[in-house]
A protein has these predicted regions:
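Charge-rich, low-complexity N-terminal segments
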Residues: 1-86
Length: 86
């Protein structure tokens, strides 16, 4: 794993965890089963790194301790939270 690339993914995952954690808290959700991210094919994000690093980012949020990360590749450059399953 190239550290610079991995840090890029970790930073984005930290934002995803922060956002989903806030949504869970606002809605009194104690456990999130899965998060589906749509990742653009030319976004520069490496799905394998996102998957490997997700548990590291999720460790900071109790509601995400057992969450499975799902990744859907789509056309484009972005990364979007498509679905939060609870």
């Amino acid at each position: 794993m190239v550290m610079g690339v991995a840090m890029h993914e970790l930073g984005v995952l930290n934002q995803v965890v922060k956002t989903v954690g806030r949504i869970a808290e606002q809605n009194s959700i104690v456990s999130i089963r899965h998060i589906t991210l749509q990742v653009g094919t030319v976004s520069g994000f490496v799905p394998r790194y996102l998957t490997k690093l997700f548990p590291v980012a999720a460790d900071s949020c109790p509601a995400l301790q057992k969450t499975k990360l799902r990744i859907e590749m789509v056309e484009g450059r972005g990364l979007t939270i498509k679905e939060i399953g609870y």
